[in-house]
Amino acid sequence: MAAREQANSVRRSGFFNPFIGKRPFFRPGSGQTAETERPRPPQHSYCTEVGSFKFIAPRCLDEEAPADQRRGVHVGTLERPPKVYCDGSEYDVLNFASGGCWPRRIRVWNGQDFRGDGFNPRFERFHVYDIVETSESASHDDPSRFAELSRPSGSVVTLLGMSECGKRVAVHVYGVRHYFYMAKAEVDSACGITTEAELVRAMVDCAHSSALSAALGNGNGGKQSGGSGGGWWGGKHVSADCFKVETVCHTTLYYFGSKPALYYRVSASSSRLGGFICDNFHPEITKFEGSVDVTTRLLLDNENFTSFGWYRLRPGTHGERVQLRPVERHVTSSDVEINCTPDNLEPIPDEAAWPDYKLMCFDIECKAGTGNEMAFPVATNQEDLVIQISCLLYSLATQNHEHTLLFSLGSCDISEEYSFACVQRGEPRPTVLEFDSEYELLVAFLTFLKQYSPEFATGYNIVNFDWAYIVNKVTSVYNIKLDGYGKFNKGGLFKVWDIATNHFQKKSKVKINGLISLDMYSVATEKLKLPSYKLDAVVGDVLGEHKIDLPYKEIPSYYAGGPDRRGVIGEYCIQDSRLVGKLFFKYLPHLELSAVAKLARITLTRVIFDGQQIRVYTCLLKLARERNFILPDNRRRFDSQADAASETSELAMDSQSHAFDSTDEPDGVDGTPDAAGSGATSENGGGKPGVGRAVGYQGAKVLDPVSGFHVDPVVVFDFASLYPSIIQAHNLCFTTLALDEVDLAGLQPSVNYSTFEVGDQKLFFVHAHIRESLLGILLRDWLAMRKAVRARIPTSTPEEAVLLDKQQSAIKVICNSVYGFTGVANGLLPCLRIAATVTTIGRDMLLKTRDYVHSRWATRELLEDNFPGAIGFRNHKPYSVRVIYGDTDSVFIKFVGLTYEGVSELGDAMSRQISADLFRAPIKLECEKTFQRLLLITKKKYIGVINGGKMLMKGVDLVRKNNCSFINLYARHLVDLLLYDEDVATAAAKVTDVPPAEWVGRPLPSGFDKFGRVLVEAYNRITAPNLDVREFVMTAELSRSPESYTNKRLPHLTVYFKLAMRNEELPSVKERIPYVIVAQTEAAEREAGVVNSMRGTAQNPVVTKTARPQPKRKLLVSDLAEDPTYVSENDVPLNTDYYFSHLLGTISVTFKALFGNDVRTTENLLKRFIPETPHKTPTKTQALLERAGFEKLTPFTPEEESRRILHTVFCTLEAAPHQS
């Protein structure tokens, strides 16, 4: 490695490599260690002493070696501590006392106290950002109250955060017990017991049983989410003191018919033991709430406790004091650690400020080693190396950019121009850290991560790539344990879950104790609708900036080109992190997510990675506890796997209303299919298996649209918060649902309960004065909270307003999760009957609204009786009113005979009248908008113009991000003509009023000539030479690993395999893959054959008996997909026929509403505008014709050709003349 000498600033003569040169104290190979005696087992698992390590470095860094010896990598063993070179100095990576060359916040390292003599550990107020659950075993000679609470083993909940005075703190909370419930009658019958003491003995016997004891000793059956403060003991050490059993009276959550009953409340000293007993003690007995972890118990069982916010330390109930942990007993990298119990904590719910947490924005660059350096690197290949890591460090409190670090394998010189530009922007100069080997680089990065200990980390696609690559590399190649590199020093969670390995996951997950990972790629895909989510496209759209791109294929040559060229890679790497940092502070995702965490009382990591279900579950669990209900246990444990299983169903529910968009269905009200599938499932989540659903679940309902182009005003009424308001208005809940009228004895229909026909079953829900809905209470409180928060925004400071806006947005997200929570068959607490009832009520509301409008406002006189102001809004047309569409929570009403201004003005009064006359509070209609012109295509597909000329569209191809810009441009141009051009709009209205078949034999209205000119322009443009490939790029998401696709003949998969065939950089899962469709050439056919062989879709040639040559087989469009970069670099011709056909197909689907939704007729009529391809007479034939006296025809000019086409379209004879 080259580095700058401290004495004379002269570059070091060469990269140090143990395989080509000797230096003092460095010797390749393995040998004796420096240790002479066995040290005391460390209380940490992060590296503090390394005497030898696996040395892997690229040969291209051997700058003085011949060119033919600079390919591949060196692999061996090096005996010396890991080193880093910075600004001409050499440092021991693991020597904390030497000062180091990166910023450090940690003050306790390797059991030694570096806090200084004047350090004062005292604090009172502290902020919590993460919570970790651990198990701890107390020694027998420890007399403290905390030892008593964890003997022989107990759960400890550690609150990680920062004190008001800026100390990094870890507060260990003891005495939080895991507990669950079992019905006393069921347990007594199964075990032949009658008392609590007998139950304790039975559970101890269960733990002592030979087979189960071994499992308990191995940690099966319990939850371990953080570090460990002590060793684990086997089942043989379980005693009666480990359990506490009480007999309590509760009611199960499911169904109104459930009565209060006696339950055993079984609590255990640790979640591992409690989980083991819950799973293994008489599995046939139904358990309640056994999957709830002790972190959730701490937050829910104590008033106002929060997962993210401020606390104050105080004396306990009986004056007990907190205990300061000595440095030698620290289990985290915090400055101060204390022991306490829940009563030592006082939450401060109204404090919204954040302490000075730190954000690390990082990016890694990798390079393939042996073989083809152009291949994309794989972490488990030891030769595929991490060559650079950029780390930009920010303060979340001030948003200041405080440090820039670049970890580089080999020497790296950042240009002075780049450093000066950083200073000019007010950013720190980059600090370059140079390493001899990849091991040293990675150990240094992990050590920096430990010593700087940022609370938050971000980057772009770090979950799918950067974190995953680092974790796989250090564990598989270097066998480094990562459990000590989070906040905990040992036994902490540091794990990546790859989406490709879990069928249920929608996205990969990263969970690192004490470090919250916020991936800006996920934020961008959720907040933006773009055809590409490459970083350059996102920052271009959001920030108006563009990154300087360095193609992956150029990295090897730059890397081998010396320190200056490696500096270019470094600048590129830093640039990516810098742009992501700007995106982070643009969207501030930590504010919204932390607001969700506070409201749902779950950790930030769970908010980010564990789906919607858990958010509602914890809130319901807390309210149920206050109302003396208990929740049945789910068959899965209460962890990320439970939510992962429900994510797929949540996705299905989100998309269910689009299922029949492209099909023709009968008139009237129709619905979508069963969103949860047809398999049997148990609604009580923990009841007896095999109990199937008794009700078919149908999704959102719609009133069929009156397709066409509407030039009269169309007012749109929306139901405000439809599903939450239905749940509130009709008191829907697990606890208010009755399945049999027997359970309603003594109650009067309509007065005390409502009956709903759902499918072929009657469902009954009691009214609120009989039993109030728990879901309704949650929604009411949340919506009131949101209203109060929004009311504070106008009078708040700008900083407070941002926080409040994120808070109200978080409340909205959770409110909208309630309906989906009940409707997921394999969720945490399913009740499909509630979800089915909600959609049934929504359907009835649409029908009632339609009937009300058609009867109450049927004539002009009736309308003016209801709204006298309507008299002044008459126009020349005869009056009529009609509901032309109903879409789940919206109603479209067309008024003829009223002005647009009048309908707009009357809209609010009309919606209030319908709400008052038809619906219970809080259900209400609101006037959302009024269309001046509306092209209503099919369900959930329309385009229109509202007041002020603003265009609104939904569901049409024009706004789909997978279309290319060429198609979007011309399709949008045609839509603009339809909506904004009076001539075209008038012509379109005439077309709509005539049966579509008639237009086949008659001319289109003359206003359509402008349509024709646009189509001719598009045709001429696509048939012209020198097309810009960028205008024809389409994209599709790689939703899962390619081998997981059933149908592999998809365009973006074809491009994926072509990239693999050419050893290009491969897209990650969830990334959008760009592609174009190319012409079918011989080269395209050859590559299609290779790709089909790679993905196992090759077709066997057809064998015929004759030797006759077979006709050329036309390839599928998917086989003709190609990488746009490859097309540009190699001048591959585009498939212009495909693109123009695609344009025709797109606009035909959009404008089919003009022609009775007949796509074929629409396309045939539009094809009238397309010029015929002229037939070229062969030269020889032309000469013969000329000699015979025929005149040579000259081709038409484009203008003349367009004139003739339009004349043909608009002057078509209605009948052909008869020949004489």
From Swiss-Prot:
Residues 646-660 have a biased composition (Polar residues). Its EC number is 2.7.7.7, 3.1.26.4. Gene3D superfamilies: DNA polymerase family B, C-terminal domain, Helix hairpin bin, Palm domain of DNA polymerase, Ribonuclease H-like superfamily/Ribonuclease H. Its main location: host cell. Belongs to the DNA polymerase type-B family. Replicates viral genomic DNA. The replication complex is composed of six viral proteins: the DNA polymerase, processivity factor, primase, primase-associated factor, helicase, and ssDNA-binding protein. Additionally, the polymerase contains an intrinsic ribonuclease H (RNase H) activity that specifically degrades RNA/DNA heteroduplexes or duplex DNA substrates in the 5' to 3' direction. Therefore, it can catalyze the excision of the RNA primers that initiate the synthesis of Okazaki fragments at a replication fork during viral DNA replication. PANTHER family: DNA POLYMERASE CATALYTIC SUBUNIT (PTHR10322), DNA POLYMERASE DELTA CATALYTIC SUBUNIT (PTHR10322:SF23). This is DNA polymerase catalytic subunit.
